[in-house]
């Protein structure tokens, strides 16, 4: 079965014209259906019109699509980007960060580099340096398995991009743009590369990433420069396209060459030779944004040098999770843990029966170390959390049950992923989703559906309070907690007449049983779960 393509929009310089942009996006979606993401390059903010931005910042208005933006290109707009590692600017609008790799739950890989080129030290807050470009290349290009990335986002054009290609109009690509971006594009081999800043639209003919008859065929790259939003000449500033992540594509299909493909504009331009030594110098530690894909089974955290922690000959010691300020009921090494409830132990996580559970097989996935929420987990812990979730889904499905997972990062000190089975005979996944949405509306809780190909780490920052629920279908609902939040909300929904029909069990304190009964349930669960226990494979 063919993989369903993602539908994306890319945009040039917004320059503070948010209403024009988002009204246009709404019109496109009304006509052509919803898109998954909007990617903005160039200047997102302008020098004026702060009043318009305030409406989005305060929630009076909301972007109609999950939007990711690059950072400042001048000193004037640095003030809008408070966190170099990326942050949420407004609801549905996220600043990616100065540089890094963004991987969606679909496997789509986007590399981003904010700012303009600077060869001076110290580097201004709105610029990138040769070291920044080198670190991005080393993150990916040092492994023999590397084939390229899906999308590259930069604000400046790459220098000499017009070589061997169609005319770029009034822009002289030999003088305009960044040689560092040219080098980055050469190394990363993006399938799509978007840029802006030149107030014009230019879609270059696709170029090849291999030398004919000397190298194996590789995919082609399409470079698209976009104009500024609302420009009077009506130059194109929005670009719609569909893409299947390259990791999911058949190799032969991926490397098919378009009929109008050209030579690589950078290979013979001398750009790589002239700056190669400069950008491939050793990289110092630097702040670099990483998004960990909760559905990326092989996800690994890369250091700012780009070396894979599992393959480096001199790996750094993994950073220990933060220590709890006092006794913690859920840190596995803590004497406060009720160890008779523990039913399975992995390398980074463990499984325990819930105390006062909604059912006899209501379990928790917990990190062994002290982490407060999913968004704070390291890559290796995320990977094992996902492994437990997938295994529990198979386990419960074999027993005729759905699997509902939720997290409440509010008034809790240690991550607890609640995993509650719901008999398939009781409810459909649509029933479960509707129950959450209905009860949220009744309690004036804004429960939003996360776009299918986003994950929670892209929406919530470490330390932010939130509630999050995930269904067997992969659908995810999210609420950003701003003030008060009912602590038992997740249980109340599942205990309601619409789902499990045990409303008297909405509070766990009313469901406690004796330690002997808990031990009996734990023994039974261990025995039933054993055929699915992936820890026995190690």
Swiss-Prot record:
Highest taxon of the lineage: Eukaryota
Swiss-Prot/TrEMBL keywords: Neurodegeneration
Keyword flag Signal: no
Molecular function terms, GO-annotated: RNA lariat debranching enzyme activator activity
Protein family (similarity comment): Belongs to the CWF19 family.
A Pfam family this chain is assigned to: CwfJ_C_1
Name of the protein in question: CWF19-like protein 1
SUPFAM superfamilies: HIT-like
Disease link: Spinocerebellar ataxia, autosomal recessive, 17: A form of spinocerebellar ataxia, a clinically and genetically heterogeneous group of cerebellar disorders. Patients show progressive incoordination of gait and often poor coordination of hands, speech and eye movements, due to degeneration of the cerebellum with variable involvement of the brainstem and spinal cord.
Free-text tissue specificity from the UniProt record: Expressed in many brain regions, including cerebellum, thalamus and occipital, parietal and temporal lobes (at protein level). Also expressed in the spinal cord (at protein level).
GO biological process, one term: mRNA splicing, via spliceosome
Segments of this protein annotated with the region Disordered: 298-324
GO cellular component: post-mRNA release spliceosomal complex
């Amino acid at each position: 079965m063919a993989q369903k393509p993602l539908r994306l929009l890319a945009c040039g310089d917004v320059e503070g014209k948010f209403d024009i942009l988002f009204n246009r996006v709404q019109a496109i979606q009304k006509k052509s259906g919803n898109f998954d993401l909007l990617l903005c390059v160039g200047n997102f903010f302008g020098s004026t019109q702060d009043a318009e931005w305030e409406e989005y910042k305060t929630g009076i208005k909301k972007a109609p699509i999950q939007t990711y933006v690059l950072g400042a290109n001048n000193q004037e707009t640095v003030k809008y980007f408070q966190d170099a590692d990326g942050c949420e600017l407004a609801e549905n609008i996220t600043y990616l960060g100065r540089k890094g790799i963004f991987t969606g739950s679909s496997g789509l890989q986007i590399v981003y580099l904010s700012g303009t080129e600077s060869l001076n030290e110290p580097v201004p807050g709105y610029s990138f340096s040769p070291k920044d470009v080198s670190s991005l290349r080393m993150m990916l290009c040092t492994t023999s398995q590397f084939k390229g990335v899906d999308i590259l986002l930069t604000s400046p054009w790459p220098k000499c991009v017009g070589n061997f290609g169609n005319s770029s109009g009034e822009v002289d690509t030999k003088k305009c743009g960044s040689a560092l971006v040219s080098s980055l594009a050469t190394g990363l081999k993006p399938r799509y590369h978007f840029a802006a800043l030149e107030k014009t639209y230019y879609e270059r003919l696709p170029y090849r990433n291999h030398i004919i008859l000397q190298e194996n065929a590789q995919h082609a790259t399409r470079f698209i420069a976009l104009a500024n939003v609302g420009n009077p000449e009506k130059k194109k500033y929005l670009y719609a396209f569909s893409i299947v992540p390259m990791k999911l594509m058949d190799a032969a299909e991926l490397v098919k060459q378009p009929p109008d493909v050209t030579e690589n504009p950078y290979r013979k331009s001398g750009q790589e030779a002239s700056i190669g030594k400069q950008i491939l110098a050793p990289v110092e530690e630097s702040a670099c944004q990483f998004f960990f894909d909760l559905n990326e089974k092989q996800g690994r955290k890369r250091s700012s040098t780009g070396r894979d922690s599992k393959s480096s000959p001199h790996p750094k010691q993994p950073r220990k999770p933060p220590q709890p300020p006092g006794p913690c009921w859920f840190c596995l090494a803590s004497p406060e843990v009720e160890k008779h409830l523990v039913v399975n132990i992995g390398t980074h996580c463990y499984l325990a029966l819930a105390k006062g559970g909604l059912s006899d097989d209501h379990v928790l996935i917990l990190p062994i170390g002290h982490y407060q929420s999913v968004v704070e987990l390291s890559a290796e812990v995320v990977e094992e959390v996902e492994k437990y979730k997938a295994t529990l889904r198979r386990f419960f499905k074999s027993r005729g049950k759905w699997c509902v997972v939720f997290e409440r990062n509010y008034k809790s000190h240690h991550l607890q992923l609640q995993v509650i089975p719901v008999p398939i005979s009781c409810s459909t996944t649509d029933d479960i989703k509707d129950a959450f949405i209905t009860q949220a509306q009744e309690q004036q809780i804004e429960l939003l559906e996360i776009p299918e190909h986003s994950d929670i780490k892209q929406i919530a920052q470490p330390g932010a309070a939130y509630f999050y629920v995930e269904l067997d279908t992969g659908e995810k609902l999210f609420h950003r907690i701003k003030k008060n939040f009912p602590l038992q909300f997740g249980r109340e929904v599942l205990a309601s007449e619409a789902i499990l029909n045990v409303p008297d069990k909405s509070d766990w304190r009313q469901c406690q049983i004796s330690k002997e009964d808990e031990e009996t349930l734990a023994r039974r669960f261990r025995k039933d779960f054993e055929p699915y226990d992936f820890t026995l494979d190690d």
